[in-house]
């Protein structure tokens, strides 16, 4: 399957996992023979992920999840090769991309510290071309000693490079979402992480935020980024991402209110609460808001 059955590259392929028994075998099979090191960093899977990784010849390291950026930075420290390719378990390297990676690393000058790779997102059984889902480039092929992930960005992580970045033409195949329920559930998780990040950054929502941000996102996804090209699916994705914006800012508002109460001891009195009657003890804190919303 690999072009010319070439020798493995001085490359570490790293996959972060949590309960990925369904996707991981296909991911690892797609990079067989590509890299000298295949590393799976697992954060506590209770399915067959670890067993399947080892059966495929991958090294497995266990590390408690402390955030995506933190997890990737820790994985970079474990890379034994000068180049690193980060993959998600539901991504696949095509033979064309395999050949291009080999050529790119063979020709990379000292000034190049990374490569952007386009992503072909497959959702609900089809390739999504509009709405910002294509080419959806990510900085995934990195020089191990010259790349770090910004710790303050937890969703859609940002890489800081000591050097220049070039681009590859052939895409990763991303088997992104197979059902609408799966898509909405993951966006809800991302909203919670983003809300926490907004609070840490000191960004408070204003009244116009709750209407303005979702409206802008809907227009951006469906019109500016031509989500209409994907028909009803494109409309669903645009509306869902607009809802994601609203959900994120509503969660941020709840976090800010909880933080303000915890720091000042001030209690919000519900409308109509009887005068002279003491409010019960509050039990709401940041962790409860995140879990229970």
Residue ranges and their predicted role:
Residues 30, 42-51, 88:
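A conserved acidic beta->alpha catalytic loop
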Residues 1-30, 256-293:
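N-proximal low-complexity "stem/linker" segments adjacent to membrane-targeting elements
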Residues 22-25, 47-56, 96-97:
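Acidic helix N-cap motif at the loop->helix transition within catalytic regions
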């Amino acid at each position: 399957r690999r072009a010319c059955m070439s020798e493995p590259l001085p490359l570490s392929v790293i996959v972060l996992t949590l309960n990925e028994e369904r996707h991981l075998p296909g991911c690892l099979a797609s990079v067989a023979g590509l890299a000298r090191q295949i590393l799976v960093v697992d954060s506590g899977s209770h399915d067959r992920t670890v067993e399947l990784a080892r059966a495929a010849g991958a090294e497995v390291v266990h590390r408690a999840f402390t955030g995506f950026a933190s997890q990737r930075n820790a994985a970079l420290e474990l890379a034994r090769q000068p180049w690193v390719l980060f993959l998600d378990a539901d991504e696949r390297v095509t033979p064309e991309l395999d050949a291009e990676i080999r050529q790119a690393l063979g020709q990379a000058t000292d000034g190049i510290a990374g490569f952007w790779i386009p992503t072909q997102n497959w959702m609900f059984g089809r390739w999504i071309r509009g709405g910002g889902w294509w080419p959806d480039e990510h900085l995934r092929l990195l020089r191990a000693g010259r790349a770090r992930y910004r710790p303050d960005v937890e969703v859609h992580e940002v890489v800081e490079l000591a050097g220049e970045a070039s681009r590859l033409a052939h895409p990763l195949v991303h088997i992104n979402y197979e059902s609408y329920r799966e898509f909405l559930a993951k966006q809800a998780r991302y909203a919670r992480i983003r809300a926490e990040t907004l609070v840490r950054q000191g960004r408070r929502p204003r009244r116009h935020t709750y209407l303005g941000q979702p409206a802008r996102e809907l227009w951006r996804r469906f019109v500016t980024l031509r989500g209409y090209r994907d028909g009803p699916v494109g409309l669903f994705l645009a509306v869902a991402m607009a809802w994601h914006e609203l959900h994120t800012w509503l969660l941020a508002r709840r976090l800010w209110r909880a933080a303000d109460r915890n720091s000042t001891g001030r209690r919000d009195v519900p409308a109509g609460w009887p005068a002279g009657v003491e409010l019960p003890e509050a039990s709401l804190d940041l962790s409860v808001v995140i879990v229970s919303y």
